Amino acid sequence: MINPIAFQIGPFAIRWYAICILSGLILAVYLARKEAPRKKIKPDDIIDFILIAFPLAIVGARLYYVAFEWSYYSKQPFIEIFITWHGGLAIYGGLITGALVLYFFSRSKFINTLDFLDIAAPGVMIAQSIGRWGNFINQEAYGAAVKSLNYLPDFIRQQMYIDGAYRQPTFLYESTWNLLGFILILFLRRKPKFLKQGDITAFYLIWYGCGRMIIEGMRTDSLYFMGLRVSQWLSALLIILGVVLVIYQHRKKDTPYYYTSLETEKKNA
């Protein structure tokens, strides 16, 4: 089994989970800063946004998890709510918080919210792909017991042997799904005559929503509300929002193309 602690710095334990999250964050920031000028967004605005959004997203991810596991946390010492290294960060809580921060931040900077979402979506997708490996090392976000995992490398099989049985590596399914989504976004961005403002955001919503809805049904650690898997309902909502956004943006006569600002700059140069 892989030790969840990567190394120690004095009394502080640096966990693989944190390394995975930070690695995804750094890559997401790099990608967004690289794309920002094409949307006439200052790269420094990306840094300013992350400094606000990232800590709040962690808080949101934790509060979301605690809220839906209140039957457990209500019986624990209050300090347990703040001990995130025991597990319990829900990605949907982080996404919702991050989206709210992005909306208000973009308005305060007079940036079109869809433009900001479009440049953020690819980085979020790949960051989620990397972050799932933190779940792997923590032995969480897995599925039901299976007879064998012989089709996987030894290190994954060994880590997925939990409570006396091999488990469906749902973390791997979602990580792979998000990686494919990221690659497809890069391909879509090469189609300037087709892509419109908001299309990348819509693709993210639909792609992630579809994958998460299916994979969530395989997991054994889902959060429930009134007997229903919360993440599946939210996934369905993402899909609906994505479809509505595509239809709305493509029916609007004045919706700019994704690269309109870039092409205009080239013509005026």
UniProtKB/Swiss-Prot annotation:
One CC-aspect GO term: plasma membrane
- Class of enzymatic activity (EC top level): transferase
User: What one GO molecular function would you report for this record?
Assistant: phosphatidylglycerol-prolipoprotein diacylglyceryl transferase activity
Entries under Pfam families matching the protein: LGT
Localization per Swiss-Prot or TrEMBL: Cell membrane
The question of whether Metal-binding is a record keyword is answered with no
Pathway assigned to this chain's UniProt record: Protein modification; lipoprotein biosynthesis (diacylglyceryl transfer)
Q: Say if the entry is tagged with keyword Amino-acid biosynthesis.
A: no
Tell me which PANTHER family the record gives.
PHOSPHATIDYLGLYCEROL--PROLIPOPROTEIN DIACYLGLYCERYL TRANSFERASE (PTHR30589:SF0), PROLIPOPROTEIN DIACYLGLYCERYL TRANSFERASE (PTHR30589)
Q: What does the UniProt record say this protein does?
A: Catalyzes the transfer of the diacylglyceryl group from phosphatidylglycerol to the sulfhydryl group of the N-terminal cysteine of a prolipoprotein, the first step in the formation of mature lipoproteins.
> Which protein family is named in the record?
Belongs to the Lgt family.
UniProt name for this protein: Phosphatidylglycerol--prolipoprotein diacylglyceryl transferase
Q: Which organism is it from?
A: Streptococcus gordonii (strain Challis / ATCC 35105 / BCRC 15272 / CH1 / DL1 / V288)
